[in-house]
Each structure stands twice: as C-alpha cells, then as structure tokens.
Amino acid sequence: GWTLNSAGYLLGPHAIDNHRSFNDKHGLA
C-alpha cells in the first residue's frame, strides 16, 4: 500500500482495479 493505493480509493473502483493490475504486473502485490 502506497500513495497510488489511496489515490485509487479516491478515484473509484476502476482506478483501484488498475492499480492492482499494476502491482500484479510488477510483482509488488
């Protein structure tokens, strides 16, 4: 959980899903 996590929460579920996909691609999840 970092800055984008909070930003994604504020932007909405679409942003959260995009952020989760980003983490998965980089193995940060």
UniProtKB/Swiss-Prot annotation:
Pfam families: Galanin. GO terms for molecular function: galanin receptor binding; neuropeptide hormone activity. It is found in: Secreted. The modification Alanine amide is found at residue 29. PANTHER family: GALANIN, GALANIN PEPTIDES. Belongs to the galanin family. This is Galanin.
